[in-house]
């Protein structure tokens, strides 16, 4: 922005808005109008014109640079500050809080000018903060009134009051702003439309009687939306929501399309199936038996209704309508379904399967019409209660149809739903980027302003210059801005006098220098920027550590922290000028919630954001928000003596005051010498936080320095002027809260300090926390007296310990400093709560206080980085999500009220439709709380069941609309935004371990000390033993030096120095989990000896290592830099002998056998040594010479074995065997006993397999040697599995096969398929990726478990023992409280009458373990209802539950779902995605889920441009055929066929199950027409394309469909009976629509999505394969354990573990965690009376139908975790990844489609695919292309300017043309050359024929000749051209007369242009594409010029040809 434009900031920039100012504006407008020529007036809003300043927008706060507003200027019209409005009629008004409001200066309502007192008053009221508060309160009160379900009469008056207030508000707004004509008037703000409609509706409903009032009353709910317009942060979030919804449009279209296709398939497959029921037949009454045969003959023809011929008594219709004749399972509302195919559900004896009655679930679940099918599929896609649909459909149609569900779930559900996620995340990311960019731009603008400020103030500073000389000197050297005041001493911002400032500074200076002298001379050495760069930037180099936070950690250590941010929840709404970057980052910045010691300043942005000033303000004053935060960017390391003292005043502003401070032992300063230049440089190259340009660019460095000084100045003034607390408070604090009165006390204090601050104490406290948690987790029901007394004593002890710790810490630290630290406040809070709880222990109803003890668990976060990170992430997200949560709350509130108003009455009136006893069900909308619960349940994704109820009572349309809106708005958008926020706060930095702080490392220091001690003892013992027994061997001496190094290194590791070496090393964890970067063989990064020494000499030096490898701005590492993987291994071992590599990611290992034969051919035939060197060294016998004798024989044997094992066939054979043996396992189901032959075959096969595998193992041992075999994880797996088979074989042979242990071993055979893993490359890749993720998944899993532990213990406290109830076990009903009130009454019943039973709910909260299981069911929303009902009904221990007695227990579950389920499960997704991204970086950005082959496919997909021109199908010579050919190849023909396909689909959609005969006939004929049309298309194509027709895949497909359709017309009945109905194939035709998409420009987004799907397929296939393997193993395992459990709940005749197929069907269902509770329930039956342990199973020897609860729980939980969390989330990761890649691809200016289009056009010009085109055709060709490659005619000039190389015959190669055109689109750049080389390579690869393509490049000599020839030609030609040009231009001059001024210049340009072409380097002849400007002015008539060009080109062609000869 030009400087003249800027209003000078500062208080004097405000001017009153007067009539003069209005006149001035009018004058400016008039002047501008006059200036502007007429034609320009149209495009006033030019995009590049000036824009309003975004900081001065209405609603924003006034930037602090303007200073305070003079009091008389508050709330009155002022002139507009924004230069943009200088000629617009506007003015601004500022209120006390400095919020800007902008008004139009035109008269409001044509009456009130800005100077009218009425309008002035209205404005004053409008901008006043109280007015806003009043409106806010009104809205909230109004919301409370709206929640009343039947309000009392007096509420009517309250309603009037509300309406009155709203009307008043609108009137004020209209008076102040005007109504709607100008900008900034009332109706110009969309939020005001809302107000307007609300008020209008209020009056309309009041005065006009409109019938259905309740529907209109629901509009009042919109008032709740007004909160959004009142609270500032909410508008932005709503903006973001709306943005993401816009972005979703493509996905939505795609989703609807896919769903329609699937729904059509469903309609065709299952139409009417779900009405099949089991009908009792024959009927009971014997009189019906007459004439049954005749009945059958005619009842089952047609529709089975015609039977009344013989017996009139029997009415078939009535019979099948009567529900009592159907077979019902107990407790079910719907009759049992069945099917007529062999694998469908069968009816019990005495029943037949008949289609009758209505569909299940009130008739709403069906595939009978398209709309119901669509609903069913939508439900499938959102995975809500889909197991029910799945079971019904399979039961009615047959198990084979599982395939349909697999497709829909994997393609529809996983893919589409995750696409929505991906789109939302991307939209969010983009918005974030935009905010960041805007912030940077602002920063630049304000820098300008500041410089201006500085200029204005320079004069005033001259006086102060002398005084500040010293300090400037100092600030130059040490570079710290805090004490410097280079420029604005006498700043206008300050109200202080100069003198005061100077004095203050002098005092500071003296204090400073007393301790400074000795260091200062070192610091002052040089003022050069270099020293700043070296010392100064030390701070940001350090990575995530604020340099001076801990370096002198005095008791006041934490004052420089950001604790303040904890107290300012709304800080972003008023961040100040200088923290722009920070403001955008807030959402994800880690530090908002970082506690002091761990505030890791993660990245420059957040570091800059929150340096000194804790953002904590009393009220809305913001000039102090963070001036310093920008300075912090340049803050160099503090003065080297840590004599710093700082205090925080009440306002949270830090003042740095010099003064002696006691250093604690932990905070010793770094010895100067340690940080050598090399180290810093090294660290700079590897730490990726530093912004290099900041360091390198001198101007920005200077600017930064100057800014720092300006700011620090302002800082100091602010500190003084801002001390809000009266001084007496400080006095009080110093007197009472800092205890250092007398010497002896100080000694005591020192002692206490030594003890309390010792790491071991910390360790002890941590152990206490863990023990305390354990004690709390040990509570259970029923507990013995003794046990509970032990627990309570334990609790007292722990409370005592924690209290003591707190008091000792207070003594050691003084209360003032103790409470400066977050953790201490937290401790204090918990301790006081525990004490309070002890006091109130016996008060009834306060037992909940006990659950506060659980918060102690969070103290672990102090020493557990991941937990800390999780809490921070949740904290941050809650900050950013605060607004989002509010929006969500508003949405939930609105829908809850809407539901209550619309449907509440219907639930009451029609209740009998949905419940048998006419009582309101638990889920209803009659009152607000239940309505809220329903809406919440919909947000959890469970909408279908509540919607059925609603539709049944209140009508289908209303319910569908409301529920769909909640579903789409709430569920999809908000929850996804939630996820996006979580993912964004999950940058890899956060995962970087934050263990770089003293306090935090205390634990590890303690552990380190112990480790050291143990190592010392070990070493002594080892030395002793060596002295005593072992002769010293030379070999040992060799190892010694290395070991020494390790020991030294050990000592430094145990000191918790984390070594930072480079970015891409393997980070391993040593024993105690400290991450230390261990160098790989990348030479650049390996630490050299001197560095080691510096680490060792100075143990307190801490350098941090990010675990996650970040992307570096400094160098793009090429993969070449990594040496081979085995080197990595070696260096790992060298550097880290002590560390166990548990953290190492993917099993990089030595390359697996036979993987890289081509790399080391000489090695691949030689086996390696059998034993490790150590073995050989210790046991000499292992070493044999292989040169002669036995040794040689042995060596030859090994070589032979090696050849065998390495042979491909061997591997194939083994894989085949593995598959066979796995397959054999699938036969061992419950029917094996009856099939004797199979059983014996399997037994023999089993032996054979075992022998084969043992042989394989022996061969491998001989071939590879033990060392290789047993160091490979996959080999271990083989080894263990073979062992299992061996053991069971021997046991069988010895006759021990019936032993329990052996039986359980047999089940381990299920693991056999795992061996296939290492053999299939694809799966192995996925498994490796997974293994890499395991450490972090485990970490998060642990954290989640801790998190859940809290809820579990709370659950035990609340519900233990309260779920027991008394039931009548014959009917299964619970007794009413009036009958049975408690356990003793139930007992009495049992004694008198046997049918009662006191029973517990199976899944309960009786102990912590069961609590976890219950919570898992709640978190997966499966089986959660029963648990919730039990909890809500519970009363107390041994009391009979009562319906909804404990209603608000629902809230426990709601809270758990929000924190335990949404957060933690999404966190998993976050971790997994994050992890894969890191691993991708590690593997050089390649996709880790794909094998090499698949990568090739992937790359081919990405670059379809590798197409070469194909021979087009030649046009037939025959005239008639030719015409048809032309017709068929036109686009119109294609599109019309597409339209026909769509119409055909529509007719298929119209079909319904119960359509009339007439309708069926009509559809038949329509279908016939379509078949004729499609046959016609087929015939026409056959005629015109001849045999080429079959070269195109689509055509073959069409042909097959047509044939099938024709056959189907005639043989429809027959085919349908034996095969699938042919209509299905028509559906597949829809896929042809994909072809249209290319023709539609608007469909680009959808094509991107499909492209992403195509790209994901290989990886998804691998993951699917792995999932199948897991399912296979679990299915085998399930068959062997749960085949005989009792059939109840989820296990029945079709869904069970009896056979392999059934197990797979069940497991597929649980993959999405659907219905696992039902399958688990029967397995939890452990004994009578739930099941019968002695039940016989005919045909097998097994007894009993009880399950094994522990095995069952393990089975299901592990399967859910593996499949749901891991595999499904990997799916998500792949899709997100590919989606972003695809979006990037589609954003490029030239996409694959453009290249494809180029080749399509090319085919027409080059029919024989010669790859050349004649120069003459070029112009037409260029014109025929589509944009962006199109060069429209006239294009000769441009084409010539491209200077394309030609070969003989004036032909040009297609690549040259494509390349030149591409260059024209993309412009010249380095990338172009890369692209060109790539394209040429690709072309050569795809054209082995290599047509003589290289017209220019031959040998070097030829090249030189050519170059010289060309130079000569060009020189001559240039001479000719000059002549011509001169001639022409002279003619031109004569013609044009006076207008010739420009020509000479143009002539020069032309000559230059040609010059460019003649430089020898440019022989590739591709100069710039634009035509020389001179041509137009020089032109002779077009034709001549054309001929000249042509002849020139011909000359050139000849020249080249000659030179070639």
From Swiss-Prot:
Phenotypic consequence of residue 649 to N: Found in a patient with Dravet syndrome; uncertain significance
Resulting phenotype, residue 1420 to M: Found in a patient with autism spectrum disorder; likely pathogenic; decreased voltage-gated sodium channel activity; faster channel inactivation; fewer channels contribution to macroscopic currents and fewer channels expressed on membrane
Outcome reported for the amino acid change (mutating residue 937 to C): Found in a patient with autism spectrum disorder; likely pathogenic; loss of voltage-gated sodium channel activity; non-conducting
Effect after changing residue 328 to V: Found in a patient with acute encephalopathy with biphasic seizures, late reduced diffusion and in a patient with Dravet syndrome; uncertain significance
PANTHER family from the UniProt entry: SODIUM CHANNEL PROTEIN TYPE 2 SUBUNIT ALPHA, VOLTAGE-GATED CATION CHANNEL CALCIUM AND SODIUM
Cross-link named Glycyl lysine isopeptide (Lys-Gly) (interchain with G-Cter in SUMO1), sites: 38
Effect of residue 430 to Q: In BFIS3; uncertain significance
Residues with site note (Binds SCN2B): 909
Transmembrane segments: 130-148, 156-176, 191-208, 215-231, 251-270, 402-422, 760-778, 790-809, 824-843, 846-863, 880-898, 962-982, 1210-1227, 1241-1259, 1274-1292, 1301-1319, 1337-1356, 1448-1469, 1533-1550, 1562-1580, 1593-1610, 1624-1640, 1660-1677, 1753-1775
Site feature location: Binds Mu-conotoxin KIIIA: 330, 362, 916, 920, 945, 949, 1374, 1429, 1443
Name recorded for this polypeptide: Sodium channel protein type 2 subunit alpha
Biased composition, class Basic and acidic residues, residue ranges: 511-529, 596-610, 1935-1964, 1979-2005
UniProt intramembrane stretches: 370-394, 928-948, 1409-1430, 1700-1722
Topological domains, Cytoplasmic: 1-129, 177-190, 232-250, 423-759, 810-823, 864-879, 983-1209, 1260-1273, 1320-1336, 1470-1532, 1581-1592, 1641-1659, 1776-2005
Naturally occurring in which organism (per UniProt): Homo sapiens
Residue span of region Binds SCN2B: 917-918
Modification after translation (UniProt): May be ubiquitinated by NEDD4L; which would promote its endocytosis.
III repeat placement: 1190-1504
């Amino acid at each position: 922005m030009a400087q003249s434009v800027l209003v000078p900031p500062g208080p004097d920039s405000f001017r009153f808005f007067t009539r003069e100012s209005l006149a001035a504006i009018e004058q400016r407008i008039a002047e501008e109008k006059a200036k502007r020529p007429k034609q320009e007036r149209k495009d006033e809003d030019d995009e590049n014109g000036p824009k309003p300043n975004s900081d001065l927008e209405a609603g924003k706060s006034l930037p602090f640079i303007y200073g305070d507003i003079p009091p008389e200027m508050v709330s009155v019209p002022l002139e507009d500050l924004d230069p943009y409005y200088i000629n617009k009629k506007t003015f601004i008004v500022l209120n006390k809080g400095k919020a800007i409001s902008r008004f139009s200066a035109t008269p409001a309502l044509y009456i009130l000018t800005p100077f009218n007192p009425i309008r002035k008053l209205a404005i004053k009221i409008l901008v006043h903060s109280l007015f806003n508060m009043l409106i806010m309160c009104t809205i909230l009160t109004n919301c409370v009134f709206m929640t009343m379900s039947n309000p009392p009469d007096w509420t009517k008056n309250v309603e009037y009051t509300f309406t009155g207030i709203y009307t008043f508000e609108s009137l004020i707004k209209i008076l102040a702003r005007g109504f709607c004509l100008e900008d900034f008037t009332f109706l110009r703000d969309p939020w005001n439309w809302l107000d307007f409609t609300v008020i209008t509706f209020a009056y309309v409903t009041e005065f006009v009687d409109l019938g259905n009032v309740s529907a209109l009353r629901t509009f009042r709910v919109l008032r709740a939306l007004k909160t959004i317009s009142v609270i500032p942060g909410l508008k932005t979030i709503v903006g973001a929501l709306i943005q993401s919804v816009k972005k979703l449009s493509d996905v939505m279209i795609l989703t609807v399309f896919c769903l329609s296709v699937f729904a059509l398939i469903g309609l065709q497959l299952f139409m009417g199936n779900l009405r099949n029921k089991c009908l009792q037949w024959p009927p009971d009454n014997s009189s019906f038996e007459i004439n049954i045969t005749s009945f059958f003959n005619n009842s089952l023809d047609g529709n089975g209704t015609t039977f009344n011929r013989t017996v009139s008594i029997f009415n078939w219709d009535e019979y099948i309508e009567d529900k009592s004749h159907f077979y019902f399972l107990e407790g079910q509302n719907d009759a049992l379904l069945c099917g007529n195919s062999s694998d469908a559900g069968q009816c019990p004896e005495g029943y037949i399967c008949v289609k009758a009655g209505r569909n299940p679930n009130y008739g709403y679940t069906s595939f009978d019409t398209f709309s119901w099918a669509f609903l069913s599929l939508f439900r499938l896609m959102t995975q809500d209660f889909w197991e029910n649909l799945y079971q019904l459909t399979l039961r009615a149609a047959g198990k084979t149809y599982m395939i349909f569900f697999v497709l829909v779930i994997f393609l529809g559900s996983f893919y589409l739903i995750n696409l929505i996620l991906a789109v939302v995340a991307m939209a969010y990311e983009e918005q974030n980027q935009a905010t960041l960019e805007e912030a940077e731009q602002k920063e630049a603008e304000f820098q300008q302003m500041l410089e201006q400020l500085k200029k204005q103030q320079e004069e005033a500073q001259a006086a102060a210059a002398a005084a500040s000389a010293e300090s400037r000197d100092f600030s130059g050297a040490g570079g710290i801005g805090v004490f410097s005041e280079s420029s604005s001493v006498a700043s206008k911002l300050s109200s202080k006098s100069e003198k005061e400032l100077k004095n203050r500074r002098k005092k500071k200076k003296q204090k400073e220098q007393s301790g400074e002298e000795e260091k200062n001379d070192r610091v002052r050495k040089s003022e050069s920027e270099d020293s700043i760069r070296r010392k100064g930037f030390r701070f940001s180099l350090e990575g995530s550590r604020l340099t001076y936070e801990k370096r002198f950690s005095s008791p006041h250590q934490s004052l420089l922290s950001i604790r303040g941010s904890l107290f300012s929840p709304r800080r972003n709404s008023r961040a100040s000028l200088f923290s722009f970057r920070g403001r955008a980052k807030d959402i994800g910045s880690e530090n908002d919630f970082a506690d002091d010691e761990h505030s890791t300043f993660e990245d420059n942005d957040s570091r800059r954001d929150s340096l000194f000033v804790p953002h904590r303000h009393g009220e809305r004053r913001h000039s102090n928000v963070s001036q310093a935060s920008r300075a912090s960017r340049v803050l160099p390391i503090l003065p080297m003596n840590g004599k710093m003292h700082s205090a925080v005043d009440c306002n949270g502003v830090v003042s740095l005051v010099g003064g002696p401070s006691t250093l604690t032992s932990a905070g010793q300063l770094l010895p100067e010498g340690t940080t050598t230049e090399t180290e810093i440089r090294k660290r700079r190259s590897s730490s990726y936080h530093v912004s290099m340009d900041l360091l390198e660019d001198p101007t920005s460095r200077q600017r930064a320095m100057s800014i720092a000084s300006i700011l620090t100045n302002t800082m100091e003034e602010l500190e003084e002027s801002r001390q809000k607390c009266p001084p007496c408070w400080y006095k009080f604090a110093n007197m009472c809260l800092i205890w250092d009165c007398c010497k002896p006390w100080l000694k005591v204090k020192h002692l206490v300090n030594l003890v309390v601050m010792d790491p071991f104490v910390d360790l002890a406290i941590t152990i206490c926390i863990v023990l305390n948690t354990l004690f709390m987790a040990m509570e259970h029901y029923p507990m013995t007296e003794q046990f509970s007394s032990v627990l309570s004593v334990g609790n007292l002890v722990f409370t005592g310990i924690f209290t003591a710790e707190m008091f000792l810490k207070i003594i050691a630290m003084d209360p003032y400093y103790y409470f400066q630290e977050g953790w201490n406040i937290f401790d204090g809070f918990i301790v006081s709560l525990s004490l309070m709880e002890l006091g109130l222990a016996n008060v009834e109803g306060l037992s909940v206080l006990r659950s506060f003890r659980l918060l102690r668990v969070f103290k672990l976060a102090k020493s557990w980085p991941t937990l800390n990170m999780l809490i921070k992430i949740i904290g941050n997200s809650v900050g950013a999500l605060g607004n989002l949560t509010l929006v969500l709350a508003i949405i939930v509130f609105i829908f809850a009220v809407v539901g209550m108003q619309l449907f509440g009455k219907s639930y009451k009136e029609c209740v009998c439709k949905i419940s048998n006893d006419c009582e309101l069900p638990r889920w209803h909308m009659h009152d607000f709380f239940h309505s809220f619960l329903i809406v919440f349940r919909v947000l959890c994704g469970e909408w279908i069941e509540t919607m059925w109820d609603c539709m049944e009572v209140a009508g289908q349309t209303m319910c569908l609309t409301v529920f769909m809106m909640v579903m789409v708005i709430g569920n999809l958008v908000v929850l996804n935004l939630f996820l996006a926020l979580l993912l964004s706060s999950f940058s890899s930095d956060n995962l970087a371990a934050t263990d770089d702080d003293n306090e935090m490392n205390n634990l590890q220091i303690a552990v380190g000390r112990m480790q050291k001690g143990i190592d010392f003892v070990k070493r002594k013992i080892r030395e002793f033993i060596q002295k005593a027994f072992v002769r010293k061997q030379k070999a040992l001496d060799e190892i010694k030096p290395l070991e020494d190094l390790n020991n030294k290194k050990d000592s430094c590791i145990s000191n918790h120095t984390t070594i930072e070496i480079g970015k891409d090393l393997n980070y391993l964890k040593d024993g105690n989990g400290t991450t230390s970067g261990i160098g790989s063989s990348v030479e650049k990064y390996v630490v050299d000896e001197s560095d080691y020494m510096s680490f060792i000499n100075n143990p307190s030096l801490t350098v941090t290592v990010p675990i996650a490898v970040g992307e570096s701005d400094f160098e793009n590492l090429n993969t070449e830099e990594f040496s081979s993987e085995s080197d990595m291994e070696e260096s790992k071992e060298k550097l880290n002998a002590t560390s166990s590599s548990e953290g190492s990611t993917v099993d990089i290992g030595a390359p697996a056998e036979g993987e890289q034969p081509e790399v080391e051919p000489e090695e691949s035939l030689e086996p390696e040594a059998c034993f490790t060197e150590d073995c050989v060294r210790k046991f000499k016998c292992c070493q044999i010479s292989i040169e002669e004798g036995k040794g040689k024989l042995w060596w030859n044997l090994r070589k032979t074995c090696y050849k065998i094992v390495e042979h491909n066939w061997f591997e194939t054979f083994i894989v085949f065997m593995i598959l066979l043996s796995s397959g054999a396992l699938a036969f061992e189901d419950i029917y094996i006993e009856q099939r004797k032959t199979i059983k014996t075959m399997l037994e023999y096969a089993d032996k054979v397999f075992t022998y084969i595998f043992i042989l394989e193992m022996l061969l491998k041992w001989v071939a590879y040697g033990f060392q290789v075999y047993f160091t490979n994880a996959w080999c271990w797996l083989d080894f263990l599995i073979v062992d299992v088979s061996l053991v069971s074989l021997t046991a069988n042979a010895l006759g021990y096969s019936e032993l329990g242990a052996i039986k359980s071993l047999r089940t381990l055979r299920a693991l056999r398929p795992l061996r296939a893993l290492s053999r299939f490359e694809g799966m192995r890749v996925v498994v490796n990726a997974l293994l890499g993720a395991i450490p972090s998944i485990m970490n998060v899993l642990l954290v989640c478990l801790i998190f859940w532990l809290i809820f579990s213990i709370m659950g035990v406290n609340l519900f233990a023992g309260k779920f027991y109830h008394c039931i009548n076990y014959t009917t299964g009903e619970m007794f009413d409280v009036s009958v049975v009130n408690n356990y003793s009454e139930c007992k009495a019943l049992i004694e008198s009458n046997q049918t009662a039973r006191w029973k517990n709910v199976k899944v309960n909260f009786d102990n912590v373990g069961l609590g976890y299981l219950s919570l898992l069911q709640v978190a997966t929303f499966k089986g959660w209802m029963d648990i919730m009902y039990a909890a809500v009904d519970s009363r107390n221990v041994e009391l009979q539950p009562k319906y909804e007695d404990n209603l608000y227990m629902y809230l426990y579950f709601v809270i758990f779902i929000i924190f335990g389920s949404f957060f933690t499960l999404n966190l998993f997704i976050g971790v997994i995605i994050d992890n894969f991204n890191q691993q991708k970086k590690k593997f050089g950005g390649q996709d880790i889920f794909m094998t090499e082959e698949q990568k090739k496919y992937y790359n081919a997909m990405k670059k379809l441009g590798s197409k070469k021109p194909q021979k087009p199908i030649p046009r037939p010579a025959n005239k008639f055929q030719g015409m048809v050919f032309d017709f068929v190849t036109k686009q119109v023909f294609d599109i019309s066929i597409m339209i026909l396909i769509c119409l055909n689909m529509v007719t298929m959609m119209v079909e319904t199950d119960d359509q009339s005969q007439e309708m069926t006939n009509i559809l038949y004929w329509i279908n016939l027409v379509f078949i004729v049309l499609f046959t016609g298309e087929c015939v026409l194509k056959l005629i015109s394309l001849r045999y080429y027709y079959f070269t195109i895949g689509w055509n073959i497909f069409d042909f097959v469909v047509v044939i099938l359709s024709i056959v189907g017309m005639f043989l429809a009945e027959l085919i349908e009976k034996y095969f699938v109905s042919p209509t299905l194939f028509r559906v597949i035709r829809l896929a042809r629509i994909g072809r249209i998409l290319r023709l539609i420009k608007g469909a680009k987004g959808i094509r991107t999505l499909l492209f992403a799907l195509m790209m994901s397929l290989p990886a998804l296939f691998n993951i699917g394969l792995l999932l199948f393997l897991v399912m296979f193993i679990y299915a085998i395992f399930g068959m062997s354990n749960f085949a005989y459990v009792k059939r109840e709940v989820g296990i029945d005749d079709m869904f069970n573990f009896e056979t392999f197929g059934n197990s797979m069907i069940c497991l597929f269902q649980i993959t999405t965690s659907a219905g696992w509770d039902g399958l688990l329930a029967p397995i939890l039956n452990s004994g009578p009376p739930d099941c019968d342990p002695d039940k016989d199973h005919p045909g097998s020897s097994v007894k009993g139908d009880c399950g094994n609860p522990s095995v069952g729980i393990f089975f299901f939980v592990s399967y859910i975790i593996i499949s749901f969390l891991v595999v499904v989330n990997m799916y998500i990761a792949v899709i997100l990844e590919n989606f972003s890649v695809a979006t990037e691809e589609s954003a490029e200016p030239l996409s694959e489609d453009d290249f494809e289009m180029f080749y399509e056009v090319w085919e027409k010009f080059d029919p024989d695919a010669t790859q050349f085109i004649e120069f003459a055709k070029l112009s037409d060709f260029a014109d025929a292309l589509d944009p962006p490659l199109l060069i429209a005619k006239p294009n000769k000039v441009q084409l010539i300017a491209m200077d394309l190389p030609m070969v003989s015959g004036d032909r040009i190669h297609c690549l040259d043309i494509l390349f030149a055109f591409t260059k024209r689109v993309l412009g010249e750049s380095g990338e172009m050359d890369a692209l060109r080389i790539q394209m040429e390579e690709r072309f050569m690869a795809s054209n082995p024929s290599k047509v003589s393509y290289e017209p220019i490049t031959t040998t070097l000599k030829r090249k030189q000749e050519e170059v010289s020839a060309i130079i000569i030609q060009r020189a001559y030609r240039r001479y000719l051209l000059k002549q011509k040009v001169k001639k022409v231009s002279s003619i031109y001059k004569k013609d044009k007369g006076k207008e010739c001024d420009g020509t000479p210049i143009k002539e020069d340009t032309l000559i230059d242009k040609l010059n460019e072409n003649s430089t020898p380097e440019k022989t590739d002849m591709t100069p710039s594409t634009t035509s020389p400007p001179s041509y137009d002015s020089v032109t002779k008539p077009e034709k001549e010029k054309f001929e000249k060009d042509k002849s020139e080109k011909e000359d050139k062609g000849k020249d080249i040809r000659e030179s070639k000869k």
